[in-house]
Regions:
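The feature marks the mature, well-folded catalytic cores of soluble enzymes
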Residues: 1-214
Length: 214
C-alpha cells in the first residue's frame, strides 16, 4: 500500500456527494430465480431513477439482454449515463462485494486527488453462500477500465461494505456480531481487527456496537 503522505484519505459518509452507483444485475443463476421477473422490474426502476441524476455502472452476465431491457424504459440521455460490463456473479449485493472508496484532496485544495478503491475479500458473510464470482467482480471491473480510480488490494482481510458506516470525519461504526463472526478474519483478536480497520480505512477510531446488526 502506497498512499502519498501529503494526502489525507478518508472514507466519506453515506450522504457525501457521489458521481455514480454500482449495481450487480439479477439473473437466472442467483437466488432471485423464482422471482426473476419481479426483481428485474425493481432493478429497471432503480436504473431509471439513478440515471436521471448520475452515472450507473452495471455488472451483468447478459449485457445485450440487459441493454435491451433498459432501452425500452430509459431515454437516450439516461442511457448515456449507463455503463454495462459483462461479468458473472453469484448474487446481487453490490453494497457488500463492491469496492470501498476512499477520497482525498490536496492540502491546498488546488487539485483533485485520485480516489482509492479498496478491494477487500468478500466471502458471503462468513461463507454462508457461494461467493467466488462476487469476490472477483471488483478486479474484473477494474481491468475492464470501469473505474476512474486506482485500486488497492486488501484481499488478505475480509470485509463487506454493509458491515461499516462512516461519519466522514474519521469515525467508523461496526458491530461485534459481524466483525467477530466465524469464517471471517480468525485468528485475529478484536484488538487486532480494530487496528486493521483503522489502518486500512484511515480511521481515527472504531465504534463497536455490541448488539444488533449493521
Amino acid at each position: 500500500m502506497n498512499i502519498h503522505p501529503q494526502h489525507h484519505y478518508y472514507l466519506p459518509a453515506e450522504w457525501y456527494p457521489q458521481s455514480g452507483i454500482m449495481l450487480t444485475w439479477p439473473h437466472e443463476h442467483t437466488d432471485w430465480k423464482p422471482y426473476l421477473q419481479d426483481i428485474t422490474e425493481t432493478y429497471l426502476r432503480l436504473a431509471h431513477t439513478i440515471s436521471l441524476y448520475e452515472s450507473l455502472l452495471i455488472a451483468t452476465p447478459h449485457v445485450e439482454e440487459t441493454k435491451q431491457q433498459l432501452k425500452k424504459r430509459l431515454s437516450a440521455d439516461q442511457m448515456s449515463r449507463i455503463y454495462l460490463y459483462e461479468i458473472d456473479s453469484d448474487d446481487t449485493w453490490a453494497r457488500d462485494h463492491g469496492p470501498i472508496t476512499l477520497i482525498a484532496t490536496s492540502p491546498d485544495r488546488s487539485h483533485t486527488v485520485p480516489q482509492r478503491l479498496l478491494n477487500f475479500n468478500f466471502n458471503a458473510w462468513g461463507k454462508k453462500f457461494a461467493y467466488e464470482k462476487d469476490n472477483a467482480i471488483n478486479q474484473q471491473l477494474y481491468y475492464a477500465g470501469a473505474f476512474n480510480a486506482t485500486i488497492e488490494d486488501h484481499s488478505d482481510f475480509t470485509l463487506e461494505g454493509g458491515a461499516i458506516e462512516s461519519d466522514g470525519q474519521g469515525t467508523i461504526l461496526t458491530t461485534a456480531s459481524c466483525m467477530l463472526a466465524p469464517h471471517r478474519n480468525q485468528p485475529l483478536s478484536r484488538t487486532e481487527i480494530n487496528a486493521q480497520l483503522k489502518r486500512r480505512l484511515h480511521a481515527k477510531r472504531i465504534v463497536w456496537l455490541e448488539h444488533g446488526h449493521l
